[in-house]
Amino acid sequence: MAAYRAFMIDVGRHYFSVPYLKKLIDVFAMHNINYFHWHLTEDQGWRLEIKKYPMLTQIGSKRKETILPTKKKEIDGVPVSGYYTQDEAREIVKYAADRYITVIPEVDMPGYMLDALASYLELCCTGGPYEVATRFGVFEDVLCAG
């Protein structure tokens, strides 16, 4: 059996285009990497189209700016957005599979969900309001379990 050799791309915090992901997949395939952990959600952005929940991409895929992690209080003022349609996600999965790489999609829950809470307030227990996170770290707000 082949060894488990994986790479992870965190598109939740920083969106990467489909062509860029394909280039990365090509590079990792050349190194016999066989698993791709595709980190699709994070407090800072929801990156996968879910047709039943369109606000996840209409609201959750966009943040107004980013507080720079190395400077704590400095804001870059640069909006960040982007998500993958279901067709694009299928395209990436097939592209990787053609190179013997298995894609493992990752969706955080119940924590790291400010993107979803900003999109659907009814998912929270505390009433909000919420916005897609502009800083990095750990937040207390999680999905309501009941």
Regions from the language model: what does each represent?
Residues M1-E140, G146:
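Feature activates predominantly on carbohydrate-active enzymes
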